Amino acid sequence: MEQLEEKEIIPYDVIVVGAGAAGMMAAGTAARNGKRVLLIEKMEKSGRKVRITGKGRCNVTNARPAEEFASQVRTNAEFFAPAFAEFNNRAAIRFFERAGVKLEIERGERVFPRSGKAWDIATALLEYCFENGVKIIYNTRVTGIMTLGSKVFGVRYINKRGFERKEECPNVIVATGGLSYPATGSTGDGYAFASDL
């Protein structure tokens, strides 16, 4: 008998759309904080863009003092400041080192995995999700965010078999990335979702 991948006995508290770096971090953190989390990825594996960034090495962050790093943000600074106060570049470095990824600082205070492999960063994020009980479904394309008035209550998606499904959930995090590299799955889906809200 086939296991249903889109409907669990226990409903989810959080659905995260997009299994890139931001999506995996959001999903893992929500689950670590006791939430039942579903992570939906339209590609066949997670972290595709992470795996190719920095010429395959992944420039994780910058090691400059947090205040200096934050002061460089000009666009959406009002959003960035509280988010960065919660989890800044130093916290990112600690996160990956605790996950077993040895890091090194290079010219310009850029931080890379010592192995020189972006794969290590993507793997650490995926393991973070698994360790915290995140349910991940791949080859599943979210087609819209379901709303009632101004309240979000779930997502519509097409599963890997081509069937349209709905998953109700009180919290949806859209982490679909921008339009920078469509071959990795960054096709701007999040922009469409936002314009529909």
Regions found by a protein language model. Give the residues of each.
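Predominantly flavin-linked oxidoreductase catalytic cores and closely associated redox partners
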Residues: I52, W119-D120, A124-L197
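Small-residue (primarily alanine) positions within well-ordered alpha-helices
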Residues: A19-A22, A26-A31
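Glycine-rich FAD pyrophosphate-binding loop
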Residues: I15, A31-K55
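A short, basic/flexible loop-to-alpha-helix module at the beginning of a structural domain
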Residues: M1-P11, F163-E164
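Mobile, glycine/GP-rich and aromatic-enriched active-site lid/loop segments adjacent to catalytic centers
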Residues: R98-E127, E131
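Beta1/beta-strand and adjacent pyrophosphate-binding region of the FAD-binding site
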Residues: K7-A22
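Glycine-rich active-site loop/strand segments that organize a redox cofactor
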Residues: R57-I105
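Hydrophobic anchor at the start of a short beta-strand
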Residues: K35-L38, L103, V172
